[in-house]
Amino acid sequence: MNVAVIDYGMGNVFNVERALKAIGCHVVITNDPIEIEAADAILLPGVGAFPQAMASLHATGLVPLLKQMATEKPFLGICLGMQLLFNSSTEGVLTEGLGLIEGRVERMRAKRLPHVGWNSILRDEDVYFVHSYHVVTDEAHIVASADYMGERVPAIVHDGLVTGMQFHPEKSGTFGLRLLKEWKESVEREITTGN
């Protein structure tokens, strides 16, 4: 399976690349529209602030293509990349996102931020989080969540071909790799069956 990891200057692309290769993916780190269109799936990583990330994506000219690709092929956002999938964020200044999943990004209410460390999600397995903002979306889009200081944090979201992981699966040990492998297998089923 060929995965285009979007290179827009805001992601830890090499750790993501290493994790994807470990589960058998062919990876291209790119901002080339031709390579993105040729991929079986798209992965949008992200580390940093929402406004700067959207500015960087706009600077590459990729925003219209990414919106189109999300309707045609599996699309995964990780950490800030997941937040960018939504309509908007209040981080810094109100900023429009990609709008691939209905919802918004807001600052978490916890007294101790950023949320850095390991928290349980599915099957009481721990994954690694680093963030101060979280998504607010319809319950139907939330696949799994974590609890941070009494606050529910959507950890995995999904709508159509679009999936997001708020945590870093590439830094979450064998369970993180297993989640990436499950995503890969769902992409391969999509390629094989068309659904």
How should these model regions be labeled?
Residues 135-195:
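C-terminal and late-domain segments of enzyme folds
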Residues 49-54, 83-93, 167-169:
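A short secondary-structure junction motif
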Residues 76, 86-151:
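Pocket-forming structural segment of enzyme catalytic cores
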Residues 7, 127-128, 163-167:
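Active-site-proximal beta-strand elements of phosphoester/diester hydrolases
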Residues 79, 131, 168:
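Histidine-centered divalent metal-coordination motifs
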Residues 10, 82, 134, 171:
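Short, glycine/acidic-enriched loop or turn micro-motifs at the edges of active sites
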Residues 74-76, 161:
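Proline-centered loop/turn at the N-terminus of a beta-strand
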Residues 1-73, 80, 106, 175, ...:
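N-terminal beta1-alpha1 cap of cysteine-dependent amidohydrolase-like domains
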